[in-house]
Amino acid sequence: MKVARGICWIISLLLCKILCAQTDSLHATHYVMRSTLVGAGFNNTFESYLSPLEYKGAEMRFIHESMRMTRLMSGKVSGQNLLHVNASYTDNISQTNHAYGGMLSWSYALHYQFSVSERLKLMIGPMLDVNLGVVYNRRNSNNPAQAKAYGGLGASGMLIYKFHIAQCPLTVRYQADLPLLGVMFSPEYGESYYEIFSLKNGGKNVLFTSLYNRPSLRQLLTLDFPIRRTIMRIGYLCDIQQAHVNKLKSHIYSHDFMIGFARNIYLFRGKKQISMPSKVTPF
């Protein structure tokens, strides 16, 4: 419990630093890249607290991203905000029961940018992520739902490559986010939410997490291409979230195909551009 409280304190401190860095970045550049993606795909959910069976089905997802350069390390660090909202409808293997799931995930990463060449950029740095959601199994009467609440510190890396096909500018991006240390809420094995919140008989419900008990990885692959003055973006997301705490196992595996658009904006003038000056572009 002391370790978990320590991690919570570190996360709170880092969050304050990140908010300061975001404010500081306003003075570095007015250029910002924003994108909005929507998509659908496959979901595999398993919650041993609710059922011994996996549930598989469809998922819908919304992603909003914002990136801009900061003044950190002589202006070579970019800040990235990522917001994921997804909902799933799944069945067990015999299709005799359904489960509903919903997650809200937010992350902020600071990437140091290495310009390998004029076309290739390597970015790496720390990341903070917060995740909230619920999985509902309509057949269970005593414990019909499992709350999802976890977050922590991790590492984030990105590769961006720009090229042309028939004089059409294209940008491909691969990103991987790896949680390293954090905290997670979980009931104990056989413990109900009534015992935790009504009877106040909760046990160890806030736990320390690491690669050992929460081995997770989120990967995103996108391709940008212009259509007139609009930058279209298509992508594929592989989101592997899993944990084993309090003798309870859980996982949510998502594979989604995304489509949307990206915008390069000069904030104070409201000017949208297909490209940015190379010295201030975060992407």
What are these regions (language model features)?
Residues A28-T36, M73-N81, E118-P126, A166-V172, ...:
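Outer-envelope beta-barrel architecture signal
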Residues A40-F46, V85-D91, L128-Y136, A176-M184, ...:
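Transmembrane beta-strands of outer-membrane beta-barrel pores
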Residues P169, Q175, F185-P187, L207, ...:
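Predominantly the C-terminal beta-signal and adjacent terminal strand-loop region
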